[in-house]
A protein has these predicted regions:
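Short arginine-rich
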Residues: 88-94
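Predominantly extracellular beta-rich ligand-binding scaffolds that present long acidic/polar faces
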Residues: 3
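N-terminal segment of the canonical double-stranded RNA-binding domain
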Residues: 6-77, 94
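A short, charged, amphipathic alpha-helix used as a generic interaction element across diverse proteins
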Residues: 79-88
Length: 94
């Protein structure tokens, strides 16, 4: 895995960042089930992972692996944004 920087943020901050990115809207707004195309949130989330890897094949789903708090999350998805969100959520709640 490529090393990402380690940010000193609490799990709650990370969950909020992921939630905002997953919902594509404001934190706490569950009525916006769209994925954000704002890479700021994606990189903010990856900065909080101890390690991460993005594999983007020529065809097929992007695969993202993250390591957070010693827990690994891996998820394939059509977009990098979606794969990052789901991999992080998987690591946070595994």
């Amino acid at each position: 895995m490529s090393n990402g920087s380690i940010a000193d943020l609490s799990g709650r901050d990370l969950d909020h960042a992921v939630h905002a990115e997953v919902m594509g809207g404001n934190v706490g707004d569950p009525d916006v089930p769209l994925y954000s195309t704002d890479w700021t949130d994606v990189w903010r989330v990856l900065d909080q992972a101890e390690a991460w890897r993005i594999h983007k094949p020529p065809a097929g789903d992007v695969v993202v692996q993250v390591l957070i708090g010693g827990k690994q999350g891996k998820h394939p998805a059509p977009t990098v944004e979606e794969a990052v969100c789901k991999a992080v959520l998987k690591a946070r709640h595994s």
